[in-house]
Each structure stands twice: as C-alpha cells, then as structure tokens.
Amino acid sequence: MPLSYQHFRRLLLLDNEAGPLEEELPRLADEDLNHRVAEDLNLQLPNVSIPWTHKVGNFTGLYSSTVPVFNPDWLTPSFPDIHLHQDLIQKCEQFVRPLTKNEVRRLKLIMPARFYPKATKYFPLDKGIKPYYPENVVNHYFKTTHYLHTLWKARILYKRESTHSASFCGSPYSWEQELQHGSTSLNGEKGHGTESLCAQSSGILSRPPVGSTIQSKFQQSRLGLQHKQGQLANGKQGRSGRLWSRVHTPTRWPSGVEPSGTGHSDNLATRSTSRFHQSEVRKETNPSLSTSKGHTSTGHAVELNTVPPSTVGSESQGSVFSCWWLQFRNTEPCSDYCLSHIINLLEDWGPCYEHGEHHIRTPRTPSRVTGGVFLVDKNPHNTTESRLVVDFSQFSRGTTRVSWPKFAVPNLQSLTNLLSSNLSWLSLDVSAAFYHLPLHPAAMPHLLVGSSGLSRYVARVSSTSRIYNHQHGTLQNLHHSCSRNLYVSLLLLYQTFGRKLHLYSHPIILGFRKIPMGVGLSPFLLAQFTSAICSVVRRAFPHCLAFSYMDDLVLGAKSVQHLESLYTAVTNFLLSVGIHLNTAKTKWWGYSLHFMGYIIGSWGTLPQEHIVQKIKNCFRKLPVNRPIDWKVCQRIVGLLGFAAPFTQCGYPALMPLYACITAKQAFVFSPTYKAFLCKQYMNLYPVARQRPGLCQVFADATPTGWGLAIGHQRMRGTFVAPLPIHTAELLAACFARSRSGADIIGTDNSVVLSRKYTSFPWLLGCAANWILRGTSFVYVPSALNPADDPSRGRLGLCRPLLRLPFRPTTGRTSLYADSPPVPFHQPARVHFGSPLHVAWRPP
C-alpha cells in the first residue's frame, strides 16, 4: 500500500500526534525504514523505459536548445563618462580618518587592476563577432560593432592602432604612458604639433633617429610620421622618409585585415584619397596633400590615406584600393541589388577610421582577438536594450586555466544577523559598476575583441559568398558579395546608422581598459572595491549601516530624515571620487529591505514575492508518475534550494532530487512526495536574527547513549542499538532542544555545529531540521562539556556549569566599526557637523 501524505507527515514527526521524541526520533535513523519509505515514495531511481520528460514549465532539460531571439530594434545603452579618480585613497582619507590596512589593500588591488594569465590563445578576427543569429547576420554585425564603438567612446576600451600602440578617449591615468607629439608640424612650427601627420589608421611609430633609444623616442614623440613641410611639398624622400619606407611597410597590414596606405603621397595618392575619403578635406600649404579628419588629443590630427607602395607608379597597372566599401562607387552595378546603389546615396561617407584622444605604448598586441562577442537582451525585464556578452572562457578551461581568487559571500544567516533591524533602508544603483575599475595597459593584449570588417564577416558566415582571403580587395570578386539579403539589410541599417555604415564596415581591434564582465577576476575585484568603499562610509557615519555585495549597495539609518541626510552625504562622496550612480534607480524600501532576492526586516528574512510565485508555478506544472530529465531536476532544485532554509525540513527534503542529479537518472515524482514538497514550500517561515546570550544547555552522546545538562539538572538515556557517533550527537541535540526549549545549545560535535543535515539518514535529517530550526550552537570541548558524564552513564558526577557566551557571527562579510553607546533620545533632524546622539549598535 502506498504511503499516504498524512502518514508520511506523522512519520517525520511534523504533527503533534507523535509519541515521545526519545522513542520516535531514533527510529528515523534506521536504514531499513529509510529504504522502505523511499521505495513506497518511488525514490529508488529505477531505470525506467518510459521516455523522459525534457520540459517542465519554463525549465528545459537535455536535448532542448533554446533558440536565441534577435531583436532588430535593440537599442545600445548609453554609458556615462566613467573615470574613477586616481587619488581615490587620498580622497577617502580626507573623507574619513586614515584608512585601515584592509581598506588600503583592497583599493590598491583595483588602482589599477592587473590580469596576467598563464597562456593566451589568439583567434582570427573572423571569430570576433560570433554568428549567434544566422538569420540576422548583417544586423547583428552592425549592432555589435556599434556597441563596441560606443564602449570605446565611453573610455572603456582601447583601440589597437599598431602592434605596440593603442588609442583611447577620456582622461589618462599615470600608468598609461602617453606618446607625446613630435617637434615638427606641417607648418614647420615646434610645439604641440596640431597638424602633425599621423600614419593613417594604424598609428605605427616612426623609427627613432640614430643615437636614441626606442624608449626615449616613445616618450618624446607622438604617434605618427614626422616629415618637414618641404619634403612633403617637393614629394622627396629624406632620410626619415627612407627609414619610414624601409621599416613601416609591414607584411601584415596594421589594422589586422584590410590593407591601408603607408607609402609616400604624390598626385596619384592625392586623387585616390580625394576619391575615397570625401569627409571634410583640409588642404594646408601643400595643395597636393588631401587628408581626412581624425580624432586625436588635439582634435586636428591629419590622417593620410594612400594606396600601398606597390601600387604607386603608373595608373596603367591598376590600383588596389584600401577601402572595400568605397570601391563600389566607380563600378558598374551588377544587378538591382548591387551595393553600389547604397554607396552612391552619399557623397561623403566619413573617414575610414577614427583615432582616440590619447595614444599610449602597449605590449605586443597581435591583430587577433582572444574572445568572441555577441548581443542578447539586457535582462528578462528589459528587451528593448541590448547587452554585450564577451566570451573569455578560454581563461577558465584547460590545463592553463586561471585559478580565480575566492572572496566572502554572505550566507543567509550572516546576512540576517547583519541587516535584520528596525532601520530604514535604501539601495543605490551603480551605473556600469564593472566599468569603473581601470585595468593596466599590460593586460590589454590578453583581452582583445573586435571584428574583421563587413566583407570578411559576410564571406565567413555566408555560404553563397565567394570572397577568398587571397582575393580580398580585388575588383574581380568585388560584386560577389552583392545579394538581395545584404542589400535590404544595409538599406534598413542606413536609416539607423547613416554614414557610420562605412566606418563600421572596417575591421577594428579593441582591448579592455576597464575590467570586463566575462573574466572570473572581475567579480572578485568588484567585491573588494565596493566592500572597501562601504567600510569607509561605515567609519565616516558609525551611527548608520552601509553594506554591499558586488554592485548592490544599501544604506540604513534609524529614521527617514536621517536616511535622507545620509543619502545626500554618501552620494556626494561617491560622485567626488568618480563613482557614477543612477539616481533614477535609487529605491527607498522603508523598514523592509529588498536585497539579494530576500526581504529583510526586523522580524527576519523571507524570499521575495516573485520567487514565491515562481515556486508556485513550478509545482502547478510539475507532473507526477512521469520520469523527468535530471537536467530539468537540476533547474527545479536550483529554484527550490533558494527557498529551502525557509521551510520546515530544509535542504534534506530535496535529497532524493540531489541523488537523481548525481546519478544522472530520471526522477519520478510520486503524488505523496510532490504533496510533501508542495506543502513545505507553501508555508514559509522567516529566518530570524540570532541573539547573543549565555549557553546553559549542553548535549553529548556516545554510540550507545546520550546525556543532557540543563542548568543544574542532568539527564541520560540509551539507544536501542549502537548508532554512528554523528547520528547520536544529532539526536542528543534534538532531545536537548525538545526538553529545554533553549535556542542556544552547547555541543562538541562539528557536524552538528555546521547545521548541515544532508549527510544523515534522510528521514532523520528532515525531522532534525524542523526540531532544531532557530537553534544556535556553541562549541564546547569534550573535556569541559557538562553533558559528557551523563552520556557515559555517570549521573553522580557534576562538572561545574560553564559560562559560555554566544555571539552571533556575520562571517567575513562585515567590516564596520562599533558605534559608541548613546542615550535613547532621537533628534528630529541629523546634523553631520556634530556627533549623532542616536546610534545603532551592530550585532
């Protein structure tokens, strides 16, 4: 006869009808009883021949692939001009007393952050943008490239200019060794070189003169080719021109894919550049020099675009032009869907490349990428904006994987001990928190992203395209890329991006200037940074509480008026050091804080309502008597495990599911087991804050008996059969709780102290979790345990009762200073110029 739900509840001692605990509870440790119950509940994981169920509600399992959905209307989020101040430590010391060693150590970790993996694999640029959406290849390419350019303009990325140089926007840090302008400019004046000639897009450095070192040249001259005006006007090559010609004709094009001109300019170069770069042309004293405007630190740098040296000579030999996009301009349309129709829409398509405001020297950076990128929805609640996903998983795989540092994550009890109070709360939203932390330029070659340019990208992902590497840029295969799909996509994208289509069609290689989200080091660094900042805030306002986990930052104060003043002071401090807050997303919670998926109040902690609704929907759609794929069970356990501490039986109730996942077998929910779990999760109990106190109840056990010391009273008992020592100790703790009602119990068993009952017999673990719920344990050595003698049958001997205090722990998550003692008077308004008379003493 199958085990009914009511009988199962009585078996677990969850009803008040159970007999004496000392008789009933040891039975639950019996191995035969556990096997019989598991068999009655169909928990034995049989090899069923019925097909497995691979989908339950929103949970999918094996052999099910979620087709990603591309949104053609995705918006690229805007990023503020984030620049964390380099004198962060000094500003913190001005805000509060001298920083502690812990605070200084944590802040130095991120000023700047460093990342040096054991080995780095480099991939071709063709793999820079992942073909995540095969039906929307072109749209995805341009939206991803636009996202990358947005990050570069927002000071988050470096742009690779050459093998040893990069450019970026925004204010430089001291560790970013800037390459200065040379002493010669186009007008022959010495100074900043506002008209200095840069070497097209690559930014390759000119060779230093004889007698100087490479290092000194890097410090003295800015990127670019430095010629005198006379040499340019006469079209002659001086000594520097010969050096440039010999050194800077690379076998591999600087930008990684497309050839760009680095030769000397003459009339042919003038005609080719004026034909292909119809952006704002600036002609100085030399009328034969045609340039297009770039972006440098002065805003007036000149970009020289010429044909490769091999083509300079006679026009009869033909020219291999550097810009794939603009080659269509002077060709005959091949069809109604020829790309030349789009290119002829505009006279001025803008520059082929953009340069940053500053140029720096970098370690050797190949024209490759180390991780692919693609776009997804920003979050399940915001599908209008996109989020860039960067795949740097190579650093977490293989024999050369990086061992990421571990950091403290607050568990539920520590979080409740710390935040469960009668304070008023608010939470702050840090804009793009990861992108606040600067990365040392030496890490750039390990964190490269980019794209190979539209022509090569379309050729790789399209089976109909016939662009081959050795033919790239030749007129014979130019029109092979023309197709109806590409034509229609570009025509629609033209309405969004306009002439930027030309810029985005070129290859680009970018390295991270701020820490990326796709590397395991980033969460550690962000946690260290925010915890140090909160520690500074706590010491500046000892009467308040500031706490953070990753980018979630919360502030608490005794009254709403006080919280408003605290909010103003803290936000001003954070803004003064360069931390950007999204004030529109500041949430005022009142006395019930919403944090990390929990609701935390003075009464304790409960899961948030949206999680409770997910659990209800899960049980509503959970089938019975059908084998469910273990991968689906894994997802179900992930949801139920979050709320397990708030149920009667806790994690032990989920142990049959854990066993099926470990064995990679299907699991069949019997009606009784489903009803048991459903009842468990429909009635959630808050996890209460632990209170300090004095331990006056002690428990101890041997394999054959148990003993208790409750005040000056001693008790003992024996087991029917010898039990494992850990099981006996757990039973003794349950007896102590049942007989005394004390919420602080002393024991000498480390397993009982850990409060992890999943390794005990299943039925005993479920019952013990409910009996010991809300109980705090204190470790007492066996030699000093007053219950040691009773457990061995010696009631006549009474050891003196220990005065063993219990202090609630917050683990390694709290780094605040104790507040000074204060009277109970509470002023109506807080003035930060004088000490506050009302303080909250943390636990």
UniProtKB/Swiss-Prot annotation:
Coiled coil: none
Binding-site list for Mg(2+): 429, 551-552
UniProt-listed Enzyme Commission number(s): 2.7.7.7, 2.7.7.49, 3.1.26.4
Gene name per UniProt: P
Region (Terminal protein domain (TP)): 1-177
Role played: Multifunctional enzyme that converts the viral RNA genome into dsDNA in viral cytoplasmic capsids. This enzyme displays a DNA polymerase activity that can copy either DNA or RNA templates, and a ribonuclease H (RNase H) activity that cleaves the RNA strand of RNA-DNA heteroduplexes in a partially processive 3'- to 5'-endonucleasic mode. Neo-synthesized pregenomic RNA (pgRNA) are encapsidated together with the P protein, and reverse-transcribed inside the nucleocapsid.
Organism lineage: Viruses, Riboviria, Pararnavirae, Artverviricota, Revtraviricetes
Region: Polymerase/reverse transcriptase domain (RT), residue numbers: 347-690
Region ranges (Spacer): 178-346
Name of the molecule in the record: Protein P
Biased composition (Polar residues): 262-276, 286-299
